[in-house]
UniProtKB/Swiss-Prot annotation:
Protein name, entry field: Uncharacterized protein C338.12
Domain of life, source organism: Eukaryota
Domain (Inhibitor I9) ranges: 5-74
Family, per entry: Belongs to the protease inhibitor I9 family.
UniProt GO cellular component terms: cytosol; fungal-type vacuole; nucleus
Entry keyword Transmembrane helix: no
Chief subcellular location: cytoplasm
Keyword set, alphabetical order: Cytoplasm, Nucleus
PANTHER family attached to this UniProt entry: PROTEASE B INHIBITOR 2 (PTHR28288:SF2)
Keyword Nucleus on entry: yes
Pfam families associated with the record: Inhibitor_I9 (PF05922)
GO biological process: protein catabolic process in the vacuole; vacuole fusion, non-autophagic
Subcellular localization, as worded in the UniProt entry: Cytoplasm; Nucleus
């Protein structure tokens, strides 16, 4: 099954133990956790099967998620 990468932002109230639980629950469904973010926002990158995306939408501690993509801050020639 095809996997897609996402950036997941957690709610500010999520503590480190809860973040670990969320990540392990996703891994149990076939996800692969990438980077963990804790400076600008709480969250992580994840690669998961397309049929598991609904789990992100339904999770009460996930504030926002979006497909991982290359971003530029300036016009690229």
């Amino acid at each position: 099954m095809s996997q897609k990468s996402y950036i997941v932002q957690l709610k500010d109230s999520v503590d480190p133990a809860s973040m670990d639980k969320i990540k392990s629950d996703l891994e149990a469904s076939g996800a692969k956790i990438g980077h963990t973010y804790d400076t600008v926002f709480k969250g992580f990158s994840v690669s998961l099967p397309e049929n598991a995306v609904d789990a992100l939408s339904a999770h009460p501690e996930i504030q926002h998620f979006e497909p991982d993509q290359e971003m530029h801050t300036m016009k690229k020639d």
